[in-house]
């Protein structure tokens, strides 16, 4: 069977959400189709793109590709849609501006099976504006159970990640109310349940530095991380130790957020968030979404 023929039961489902990134998408999709491991389906969700994404996708004739369309609803919705439509035992996420080395799926799947893992990630190479950059120690990927570290910062990159259905059924889906930090949200929900395997090889290329990236568009990432932690506290799933860690990190993140608001003269915004968080820490019943009420999502 040739590489471009879809087997009846693909073992891996590659998930690529995309919005107005036709040029980068071709590189990402090409790196997926160029894998040495071939028993996969590749689901691309066009999340309401207004550029020539469909024209670029039409250039690919590989039968393993499935193209889905939806109105623009964000990356969380697009990923969830694709995963609902997928049939692989394993799910591999790939952002449309990143790339994989050819052996990524082969080595990662073998590693997951040999170590009996439910989720693992590879190491990655960072490329910013076309040039490779050095990663700071802060973002060095750990392995095992690292819930406390995950609360502080996002240490799992979607494009590096592969997980099985057991993992997804336990902690999914991505929160579609979040235009950003949806990965942070999923990882802190899973961080006290599943150890994360780390394949040391740098098998993923993570691109950055472009103005269209959410990093450059979202008004406040801290706000969405605060929302995520409040949701986690609200879930009642945490044990005593995890509960204290989450509360401590919530207070720290709120401190950063309030300080930023004060510097920018956004006193009313700061007061609204502070009231909600104080209620949460005092054990009062608060809807997590209250912390987002009236908040500006994007800059400009």
PLM-predicted stretches and their roles:
Residues 84, 140-228:
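Conserved nucleotide-sugar donor-binding catalytic segment
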Residues 31, 38, 46-55, 73, ...:
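A conserved acidic beta->alpha catalytic loop
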Residues 2-7, 208-300:
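C-terminal subregions of glycosyltransferases and related glycan-biosynthesis enzymes
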Residues 1-33:
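N-proximal low-complexity "stem/linker" segments adjacent to membrane-targeting elements
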Residues 23-26, 51-59, 99, 103:
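Acidic helix N-cap motif at the loop->helix transition within catalytic regions
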Residues 91:
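Short aromatic/hydrophobic "clamp" motif used to bind/position activated sugar donors
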Residues 70-86:
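Glycine-rich, basic loop-to-helix element that forms the pyrophosphate-binding segment
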Residues 103-134:
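Conserved donor NDP-sugar-binding/catalytic core segment of glycosyltransferases
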């Amino acid at each position: 069977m040739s590489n471009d023929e879809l087997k009846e039961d693909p073992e891996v489902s590659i998930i690529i959400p995309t919005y107005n990134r036709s040029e980068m998408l071709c590189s990402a999709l090409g790196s997926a189709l160029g894998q040495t491991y071939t028993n996969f389906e590749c689901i691309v969700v066009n999340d309401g793109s207004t550029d020539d994404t469909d024209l670029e996708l039409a250039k690919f004739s590989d039968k393993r590709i499935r193209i889905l369309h939806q109105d623009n609803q964000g990356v969380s919705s697009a990923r969830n849609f694709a995963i609902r439509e997928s049939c692989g035992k394993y799910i591999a996420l790939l952002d449309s501006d990143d790339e994989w080395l050819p052996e990524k799926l082969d080595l990662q799947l073998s590693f997951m099976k040999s170590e009996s893992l439910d989720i693992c990630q590879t190491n990655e190479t960072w490329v910013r504006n076309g040039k490779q950059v050095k990663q700071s120690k802060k973002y060095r990927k750990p392995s095992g159970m690292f819930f406390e570290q995950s609360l502080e910062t996002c240490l799992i990159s979607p494009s590096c990640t592969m997980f099985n259905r057991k993992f997804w059924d336990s902690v999914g889906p991505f929160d579609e109310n979040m235009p950003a930090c949806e990965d942070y949200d999923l990882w802190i929900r899973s961080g006290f349940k599943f150890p994360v395997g780390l394949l040391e090889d740098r098998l993923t290329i993570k691109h950055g530095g472009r103005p269209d990236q959410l990093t450059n568009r979202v008004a406040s990432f801290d706000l969405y991380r605060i929302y995520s932690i409040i949701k986690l506290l609200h879930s009642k799933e945490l044990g005593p130790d995890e509960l204290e860690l989450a509360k401590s990190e919530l207070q720290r993140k709120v401190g950063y957020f309030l300080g930023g608001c004060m510097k920018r003269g956004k006193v009313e915004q700061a007061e609204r968030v502070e009231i909600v968080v104080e209620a949460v820490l005092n054990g009062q019943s608060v809807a997590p979404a209250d912390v987002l009420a009236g908040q500006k999502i994007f800059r400009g």
